[in-house]
């Protein structure tokens, strides 16, 4: 949808949700520039499994890759990240 389409939908919103989110960081960044509403990102099960399979195949370092995938959403403008990896990410952040 174009920016004009979604802007009329946010009038009474408490937050904006982007899901799936990993492939839509450009949308998150545009939303961040356009609104003061909190932006929530939901890494859906398919995105989580894509990361887990990359780790299992040796294509992605678990700690660095999982952490970067989630921190990149924050850099794009997300205020809240909903993820199946929440416990693991919390552990990684605590160890940093």
Per-segment meaning from a language model:
Residues 1-2, 30, 71:
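Short, flexible, glycine/charge-rich loop motifs used to bind or transfer phosphoryl groups or to couple energy/partner
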Residues 20-41, 87-96:
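Active-site-adjacent beta->alpha loops and helix N-cap segments on the catalytic face
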Residues 33-76, 95:
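Active-site-adjacent loop and "lid" segments of alpha/beta metabolic enzymes
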Residues 1-11:
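Single conserved hydrophobic/aromatic residue that forms the stacking wall/gate
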Residues 13-22, 81-85:
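Catalytic beta/alpha-barrel core
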């Amino acid at each position: 949808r174009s920016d004009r389409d979604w802007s009329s939908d946010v009038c009474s919103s408490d937050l904006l949700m982007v899901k799936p989110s990993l492939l839509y960081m450009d949308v998150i960044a545009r939303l961040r520039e356009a609104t003061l509403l909190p932006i929530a990102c939901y890494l859906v099960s398919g995105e989580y499994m894509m990361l887990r399979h990359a780790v299992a195949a040796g294509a992605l370092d678990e700690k660095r890759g999982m952490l970067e995938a989630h921190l990149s959403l924050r850099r794009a403008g997300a205020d809240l990240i909903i993820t199946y990896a929440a416990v693991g990410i919390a552990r990684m952040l605590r160890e940093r």
